[in-house]
Amino acid sequence: MTAVCQIVSTRADNLWAFETSDGRGIRKVVEYMFPVIADKRGWFLTPDVQYFDQWPVRQPSLVFAGLAFSRAEYLKMWLSLNADPGTEEVIRNFPIRQPVLWTL
């Protein structure tokens, strides 16, 4: 979803700023997921992916949201994660591997 916000947003229609009437939006999604990306032991549900141990990797959402919301900790986390996963299934679910190119 962050890739959609990054690619589709315009100055007139900024999807990063969109919120529903009850306050839901992409900012809340990233704020919810960031602590779990930082330390997946914080995930309180049963792991729902087959390759749970191979995650996280360099999520493009961290770059996009870090820039959109001026959150340096998102960018710092992105830099600390594995940029070149070797597990085929993780690679398949990691379609944007050079997110900085999408910010130019």
Predicted regions and their residues:
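Non-catalytic carbohydrate-binding regions of carbohydrate-active enzymes
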Residues: 3-63
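Terminal, non-catalytic domain-edge segments
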Residues: 11, 43-104
